[in-house]
């Protein structure tokens, strides 16, 4: 059984609790179903005014799991909710019955569905324009049953039954007959009722059938009609004998049933008690049941006075006769609880009664006072008023259920309690023996699976006494196994609950497997039998006890092994090692054969077979090519022969492809390439000393090696001496053709069908093992599932590597046992892996001693599917608008409760446009402003003479797509709004307000006459063709109203025009639209320059007045307004007599075309270039002669520097490396410079240590000089602080990297202390004449430049320049077979980077963070916002199919990091890419920086980078990206430590690329809006803006990264340059840069679409939507999250200037030509992005990749 009853009773258990607690549910029909009708036409409003709205309504009738049933969203919209309920409830009912639904395929199962209302379907079919093919089946009653038959592929009877309220029991009767006649073996019976519209309420209300309060008061004195109810129930029926045979749960037995018709009674709708009595007597007679043995009758009992009277009379006559008052027949009705479910009510009564039989209790019937016209005692019946026990009375409990329909059909069912005892498991839930078992779950989607796992965990946790075998039996044999699967291995209820909860949380811990089966893969796995190396002491020992088939197989080999080797497999397994290599060879065969038999006993079979070396023997047996006993004898003799080779050889695996390894070895005989173990690994074999020596030599050349545990050199020259013995032993074999595909690893062709004869087995031992080739062949043949049959997985990794190398990512590789791991658990976990990937398992062999239990079968993933047809949504349109009226005033409604509010509604499309001629503006058909103003005029027509004031034309009204239009007047306020007609019923559909205004009654035009002659006399005559030409240039493609320009005179401020109107024949005489249109249109010429190419449109009007009759010929006088002369005009319109009949005051125009700026990726990516230093570039710079240089630093640097300076005539003072003591105030008596000159550290000093030391040296020096200067009173000689660095520019020597931080510090000091700072000078290795050149700089360059480089060519200065694009390369792409490491990976920025890298192909991520995440079991309960954000970020990545490892590491600890990233610890492929994004911000002005704060900031960036540099030296990675900052260039205050750390990264990148490698880049980011370390963006970016920098969005940042990665550069600055404030000079480094947006337009490499190339269309569309949202946010200065994609842009605040800026941005980003009017037709982000998507050209039919943009949109 299954059910849904109001409000949310979604299971029989919940329904039962509801009933026994005597509850009821009644409420109002939901607004969504009521209001479209109640607010419709006046007739509809009147009809519904007194209609009962109350009843029992389900909370959710729109929700449906369409994906589960393979139904598209489009079709689901057209699916009657009753069909949806029937599908879901049929699935649930079958699960309750223990019948896996998918096993019914091709059976004669019948489906019977009772329903008598299809409100939803009727309503959809009324919407003729939108009725499509899906409505054929989706809107019908027959579809309720047929849909289930179609989905489950059932071939028995399938029908809808409509006998009104008797329908459900009629359907049950028909199903029972079909079962008894043998027509069908199983029947699904449903009864349903959904009230999609109030239409039937109106009819029933008019018939007097409904209770005013919506309650059914069955058999109550106050009964006054019935309350309608929604709900559905489904039953599964079987013949009792079949149910017993199949061990199915039997809830109750149907002893009989009957269906009759009352014929011609007092009226078709009138109940007939006599007919009911006759039907009951006939039914019980045919069933052979005495009515006196019936304990309880679930009556129809609707609560109508007449119906209840007739029914109780009939019941009393049949069931009450002869009964004692102490033992009456009990009567009840479920309708007071859940309402009258009409066509489904009979099933509701049956479910209630079955539950009562099962629980031996009868729930109460809700009533206040039983009917007083019934003598209950005398009649032998009693109404159940409270919960009543149901004793058995020595016979089966029996009950009847009655229904009768409004058309006269009467039906009844006789129920009896189940004769089958309640299911009890033979398994003991608490035996104390913890045996692991497998528990599979499945669903149609991942979300559904996780939800189901959570529900199952709760179910088991709440029923701890349920035997686990019964749980397993239910999940394995009583459920269908769907595509999204999980399987859990558990040995206790507690462990099962814990692991199910992990599945619910999306985690795959120990004992948990989850995957989705893939269509098109082979049904069965390829069984792979590995060779030497899987053995371990104790292997198979547990299986001997737990798996009888394993023990039997090993015992069957005893005789052969004892004869040949003197020991048996059982002895070897029981006793354990140590074993010789030869021992292992024979034992490997025995164990593999035993394990293969175990897999077969689990119901598996091989799809193909591969053997590896000795594993080929077992492979041949399993494939049917060899006899088991013959093969066992051969394996023993082979092992005995190999015994002679023990201890003479060795084998080692190396990290090279087979061919490359063989090539390196050349013709050597002492070492050979023996095994092709994987695409990038080979096993070498040969003389022990030679093999070990080769391994050592190759390891020194960075080839990884690993010793193989074997002292026999298999597959090498060593085995030549036993090859003859092997061939001789193999002659006893009788090879046969295999029965399953058998791939060879001994021959060059893996598909060779060569017989497994003696020659083959000699080759098997001597020739190289071509394992990689065999796996590749199997994969090429379509196999995607592989099972390694071994005691430990030794080749599974090689299989995985081979598949990844082929680009196959949907494969799975399972093992069998694992060393030192519980063998039963290991076996089950691997079985879980195979099952979850689609291998067929014979579940009948599992959980054989369990019984069916009530585990949840599905947790539906509901999404709303609902259509409000336009005929319904527009029911209030009334007459609609009259296009000839030139207005959009439609049907009028007065809103209830708001007498001052009036609404007119209509529909606008091309056929109903309120103007006679096409009015195209730049390609868009637009409703003229005149029609909208005329609409308002018509809305206030009843007020008499009026003025429209404060008209705001917010956004133009495009005609296409068709729109629903509403005009609303509330008091004096007017507004006109629309929404797209096809979205009118969609959730989130937004109304767009186009125009607002106010009305002032009693106002007429100022009147008077227009002195046309005086005006003519002062205005020169203009060209009549000028207007047409000008409007054509503007993009006006036609006038909305036909008029001719007869005269035109104008100057720069005034214009006179005479227009002749051509009224259309149907035009209404009261329309002013043609007059206002002519006046507004021609007046635009006053504000438009003569050569204008922009479109000027009306934006607002202060006041419009009119009076009299609209003229056919008008004179329009337009003058620039004195109040706002630039874009505002006052207009007066006169008739032929010269009388002013219309005035337009304060008509403002707006240009819809403007030059805007959009930033392209190419405008954001910059690099450092070096220009010759020219003192003339710094006119006005301080020219203070330097008389003395104070040198601070190490003697190793200051002594030689002093010598060079002194040789140039400079006085030098050396104070050592302690500025606190060395810098004394007396030294500052002469003008001079303080030069910090650290030495290059020795090779024994780490660069990170030295970087910290020299940074602190410079900081202390600046602080000390500032202190001394602050203490000096009066004028003091100028002193500037300089620093000297060694080859930071190129950093060819690693020691130079330590000086890198000084550049960043220098720039920040220049900002914090411009009065103190001189500059930084970098001395290259080829620079000469340093003394004189440095003196010149100290004298003439102080404070002018951040950094000056002295080279052999001269002095050069750093400038930012847009990246050199001459060497275009390939954007960053991650190898799917590698791992990407991200430090700072759990920060907001790190997670964004991770998601972006996934888009670039990354499939395995290691996220390093300082702070650990909680244990996964605690994740659901985490409430801390920051931790929650991190957890959600990881889960989001995993949901994309990415493997994520989160490591809590100190990135500065090389030992900790190297240990964590070791392949064996990480369990992932090698790291191929690194993004170092870790960082700490601790802002402080240079004066306030202390050593502790400096170290804190330097540590993660500097020390962390050096750890990674050493772990991944240049050439080891595909990419190494360092996250730096460009804030240093803007001299941002407080960022001294941060700039120093980032400058170190920049120098490290140069050093890593100094050789032949170019994979490293340091990215100097500007702030990212809303991410990572830019949380202080408001303050930081205020300062940055003033210095020419602006933040970027994440979209812009990633676009820039992707663009810049194509060009080789050690350092790239990602920044947007903006104009600096007036009188603020640009900093030197920015002087060569254009402001962002200064570009000639889009080129191929500038387009945002380049970031989308190769993406599936849907993903590209989603990215475009996000990008358009970003662009809108940019022009609004919003965060993107504040931009609602379906909200009109004008509502968000986008004005005409922003519109143009947005349009230009989009044109440049997408290479499209967008019309200036684009936002009129596409006024939301959703619509705009859809237009952009549709305007791009896509490759492919349905899911093509983005190719290139079209030329125009």
Swiss-Prot record:
GO terms for molecular function: fatty acid synthase activity; phosphopantetheine binding. The keyword Phosphoprotein applies. Pathway: Antibiotic biosynthesis. The active site is at residues 165, 300, 340, 919, 1077. Residues 1020-1158 are annotated as: C-terminal hotdog fold. It catalyses: 5 malonyl-CoA + acetyl-CoA + 2 NADPH + 6 H(+) = 2-hydroxy-5-methyl-1-naphthoate + 5 CO2 + 2 NADP(+) + 6 CoA + 3 H2O. One of its GO terms (cellular component) is plasma membrane. It is an enzyme of class 2 (transferase). Iterative type I polyketide synthase that catalyzes the synthesis of the naphthoic acid moiety during the biosynthesis of the neocarzinostatin (NCS) chromophore. This is Neocarzinostatin naphthoate synthase. It comes from Streptomyces carzinostaticus. The lineage of its organism: Bacteria, Bacillati, Actinomycetota, Actinomycetes, Kitasatosporales. The gene is ncsB.
